[in-house]
Every structure is written in C-alpha cells, then in structure tokens.
Amino acid sequence: MSTAADSPLSLAHYYLPVYRPRQVVLERGQGSRVWDDQGREYLDLSSGIAVSGLGHNDPDLMAALTEQAGKLWHTSNVFFSAPPLKLAEELVTASRFAQKVFLCNSGTEANEAAIKLVRKWASSQGRPADKRVIVTFRGSFHGRTLASVTATAQPKYQEGYEPLPGGFRYVDFNDVPALESAMASGDVAAVMLEPIQGEGGVMPAAPGFLARVRALCDQHDALLVLDEIQCGMGRTGSLFAHWQEQVTPDIVTLAKALGGGFPIGAMLAGPKVAETMQFGAHGTTFGGNPLAAAVARVALRKLASPQIAENVARQSAALRAGLEALNAEFGVFAQIRGRGLMLGAVLAPAHAGQAGAILDLAAAHGLLLLQAGPDVLRFVPALNLTDAELADGLARLRLAIAAYVAQH
C-alpha cells in the first residue's frame, strides 16, 4: 500500500494532459471488482470503456496469454504465425459475411483501415476523387486519428486540428430523409455508423433504420460500414449488434472486447471489397501479433457462447429494472435507453450536465461508471457480471444518487 508521499500520482505530471482521470490508482482486479493502491475495493460497471468484456483477470485469457508469452511475442507481418491466422479464420466464420480480415491494434486503426478501404474501392470502380464521399452521423465517435476524427461528426473532437481531410458529409442519426438527401447527388461511396452510438449518449439506431441505410447503399452503389468497436462482441446480446437488425454490412470494425483487455483491433471485409486492397496497400508493424491474437481467440470463443448471451439478457433486464426503481425513488432520469449491457441513463432536465458529479459520488461510494456526454450515465459492465455483483453495484449507485440529491 503506497503512502501519499510515494503514490504514483506524484508522477502524473509526466503525462501529456489529454486525460482527466479520477485521483485513484488502480492496482489489481478480479471479475467485476478492482482494488486501488490503498487497498480500497470498487465494483466496476465500466469495464475499461467496454473493453474487459470478461471482467478482470479471466483465467482462460490469462492462460492463453502466459502460454503464448512463453513461445513468441512478435514477428511483424513479413512472416506468418499460427495465432493470427487462426483468429482471422474464426472471425470470418463468426461474422457470417466477411471473407477477409485485417488485424490491427485498436479501434481507431480499424476504422482508419475501413476508411482507406472505402476510398481504395471507390478508386478501383473508376470514381473520381470528388465522388468518394463517406457519410457519417452527428453524435458518432470513430477514433482520434485525423481521418477517423473527421469521420467523428462531433466538433469538440475536431477543434484545432483543421484543416481536416475532405470527403466526409454529416447527417443526423436516425434521420432517413436527411440521409436520402445526402446521397441524392450520387457522390457517396459509403455510409459509416455505429449501430448504437456510444460516446454520443448510448443512442441506438431506431428500429428499421439500419435496413433503410442498407437499402439506400444498395440503391446508390455505396458500401455499408458498421463500427461495432463498442457495441460488438456480445455486448448487445448477440455477438454482432447488427444481427438483431438482420442487415448484411460490407465492412465491420471491431476492437475493445475482442481482446478482453489486451490491445487488438480488426476490420472485416465482405465479398464486395475483400480483394480491393492488395500487396502494399495498407499495413501495420504490431497488428495481429501472436500474443494479441492468442488472447483474442479465447475472448472471441467465450464472448460468442450461449452462456454469455443468456447472461447479457438476464443482467440487462435486471439493470434496467434497478435503474427504473432508483428513478421511481429519486426522479433523476428522463429515460433508460440502449440494448443488452450497453445502457444509458439519461438525466432529467433538472439534472442536465450533472453526469460527472454523479460519477464522482459513485466513485466515492466504490462504484466505477462512465458518462456519455454531460447528461448520460453509461453502463457497460463485464458481460459475465454476476447477480450478486449487479445487486452490489445498484446498491452503491443508490447511495451515490442519494448523496447527489441531498446536495442538490
């Protein structure tokens, strides 16, 4: 246990100050619980921003990691190794649509690869540069690289990075007429969206919206790109969120829970685009390394299991019921939205802008949560969350909300 004098927090000034973490130094985790360097225990309903889909220190992931660590960590992509080859096959099979996979290190990299693939495909079709537009949606979040942050239709993430790359067009999420208008000029090469917007407030696509987007893409010979980096890998109750809408994409991007906490990303390419990128068209030094791929293979197998799907359904219902009960008592929420274990509690107008304050109180009561903007509490726990862990989390949340109401 560290003291204030020797706390790692004294080293925080060496960080580029692009984050605003809470003043807690987490040291270890088990399941949906973590402990800080003072020995204090927290119930984690954030799972590292939807990354630790199997909780902390999952024994099967640990076994895969340690076994592979004793064999081979890295080769680069000028040589083959078995784990990424097997992972690619398993992702193609699991996806029900893909023919090829590009493995990388993060969600941003997966989306960057998808953007490049769209442009390369449009070029291969003989389309001039001004007819390779990618439509994205306001409230989206697709990453932090220059192209992916341009795809992210939120000015707060783009400010100061101008000039941004051209060839992107923004429309309101779930607005079919606006999308029809945006595609009418015939210059759109792809539509890119999250089936559930995460950073944009846990906002699901409206029923039938994805199907309409798919139809418009077919009508205009444009690609459908689905960013499932946060909502994929079992989080909504099915391995891929778009399965519930019965649409077939051309490209899907994955990361976060795919590695169960170990960094990895993937871009899945369907038959229309699978052969577009050939030798030298794209690449990565670390992407698909044997260590990450070995862990991801086990994470994929477990996240695709019926047991996870059943648990997500049960805990989602219990979490919704618990949040509704808290709202009946305190009246702080206007709406509970989302799907599976990706839920957002939207604050009532009287409490607008107070998500951060509630999160601070939650942490003080031993509960780790996220926000999705200033008005939404975001719940993205581990998908193997137990009944007891959820009950404990809701009890701690009640104490936090009671303290918040007492202060306001």
Curated annotation (Swiss-Prot):
The keyword Acetylation is annotated on this UniProt entry: no
GO molecular-function term, one example from the UniProt record: N2-acetyl-L-ornithine:2-oxoglutarate 5-aminotransferase activity
EC number: 2.6.1.11
Cellular-component GO terms for this entry: cytoplasm
Keyword field: Amino-acid biosynthesis, Aminotransferase, Arginine biosynthesis, Cytoplasm, Pyridoxal phosphate, Transferase
Cofactor, free-text remark: Binds 1 pyridoxal phosphate per subunit.
Recorded metabolic or biological pathway in which this protein acts: Amino-acid biosynthesis; L-arginine biosynthesis; N(2)-acetyl-L-ornithine from L-glutamate: step 4/4
Cofactor(s) demanded: pyridoxal 5'-phosphate
Residues that hold N(2)-acetyl-L-ornithine according to the record: R144, T284
Main subcellular location: cytoplasm
Catalysed reactions listed for this entry: N(2)-acetyl-L-ornithine + 2-oxoglutarate = N-acetyl-L-glutamate 5-semialdehyde + L-glutamate
Alphabetical list of PANTHER family matching this protein: AMINOTRANSFERASE CLASS III, SUCCINYLORNITHINE TRANSAMINASE
Membership in a protein family: Belongs to the class-III pyridoxal-phosphate-dependent aminotransferase family. ArgD subfamily.
Record text on subunit structure and interactions: Homodimer.
Name of this chain's protein: Acetylornithine aminotransferase
Organism listed in the record: Xanthomonas campestris pv. campestris (strain ATCC 33913 / DSM 3586 / NCPPB 528 / LMG 568 / P 25)
